[in-house]
Design a protein with these regions (language model features):
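N-terminal leader/propeptide and maturation segments of large enzyme subunits in energy/redox metabolism
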Residues: 289-294, 299-300
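Residues at secondary-structure transition points
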Residues: 45, 181, 238, 293-294
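Bacterial Sec-dependent N-terminal signal peptides
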Residues: 1-14
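Feature activates predominantly on carbohydrate-active enzymes
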Residues: 80-285, 299
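Glycine-centered secondary-structure boundary/capping sites
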Residues: 56-60, 242, 300
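A mature extracytoplasmic/lumenal domain signature
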Residues: 41, 75, 141-143, 170-172, ...
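Contiguous, structured surface segment used for ligand recognition
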Residues: 12-134
Length: 300
């Protein structure tokens, strides 16, 4: 179904998401072996070097053609924070933005156009900026653990689509997926199992792996928002530390935290202290999920 919407837009212009404004020109720019990629200093130089490498790794420089791609981080206060301009002419390409995020999005747009045209980028002028400040993708790793390399692939796809918030669902009923040093049983016991197999070997991220992924996301202007699910869907926690379990019923055993024990709030506070230290995001998602599979304390 998505293709029914995407293909007509790509007939007009192959960039996705559809940019705010496009003016098509004449001719095209060829990504060649003698290509020069330049920045105007600082972050633009760093991004230019990365773009040169990405174009080479994508195998797009088969032609002997020359040309210049310039990345310009400008002080133009008229440009919105994440906005960019991309001007493609037969002999040159200009990427311009007033913020690092905007210039990064211009680079991603150019890569997308280059891959679509297999090294040929048709002449155009694109002026674009996001319609929404929060452009997110959620990944549930409690039910299905993917691992560090797969998460990085998702982050690369997010960057290509100019998404900027990675909502990381790391805890739920099937398993706990983040190392908390103060509570080791969260990973030795709580990380055992997944949605399909409750006895699957423990899988989780160490704190060093979390830091690596957060840094990888930051390089792509993506904020990572972790989720510590509570007070419901706390099964993985409560089977590891049953003293804070609020009980459950039927197949939903240990579904909630116990709301009437001081130890519960001490546990939550200590866990949040470690999570906050790992994630620079101003936001931590705490779920707020249902508690109807619990003891009667929740109804008083």
């Amino acid at each position: 179904l998505l293709l029914l919407f995407v293909l007509p837009m790509m007939a007009q212009h192959p960039l996705f998401p559809t940019p705010a404004k496009v003016q098509n020109g004449k001719g095209s720019f060829v990504i060649g072996k003698n290509l020069q990629v330049q920045g105007n200093g600082g972050y633009a130089d760093k991004l230019a070097a990365g773009l040169q490498t990405e174009l080479k790794e994508a195998g797009l420089q088969s032609s002997p053609a020359s040309g210049t791609i310039r990345l310009d981080l400008t002080n133009d206060c008229k440009m919105a924070d994440e906005a960019y301009t991309l001007v493609v002419e037969p002999n040159s390409i200009l990427l311009q933005a007033s913020s690092e995020a905007g210039l990064f999005y211009a680079k991603e747009a150019l890569l997308q156009l280059s891959r679509f045209g297999k090294g040929n980028v048709r002449a155009c002028k694109i002026q674009d900026q996001p319609r929404y400040g929060w452009r997110g993708f959620m990944l549930d790793e409690s039910r299905h653990f993917f691992g560090k390399e797969k998460v990085k692939q998702y982050l690369d796809i997010m960057a290509s689509l100019r998404l900027n918030v990675f909502h990381w669902h790391l805890t739920d009923e099937p398993g706990w997926r983040i190392e908390i040093k103060r509570y080791p049983k969260l990973t030795t016991e709580g990380a055992v199992g997944n949605w399909h197999d409750p006895k699957a070997p423990a899988t989780f991220y160490t704190q060093e792996e979390i830091k690596e992924i957060v840094a990888y996301a930051a390089d792509r202007h993506i904020m990572v928002v972790p989720e510590f699910d509570m007070p419901g869907h706390a099964t993985a926690v409560c089977r590891s530390y049953p003293e804070i379990s609020g009980g459950g019923e039927g197949k939903w055993q240990h579904f909630t935290f116990h709301p009437c024990k001081e130890e519960t709030f001490e546990f939550i506070s200590n866990v949040l202290d470690e999570i906050v230290a790992l994630f620079p995001s101003p936001y931590i998602h705490i779920g707020g999920d249902e508690v109807h599979y619990g003891n009667q304390s929740w109804f008083t």
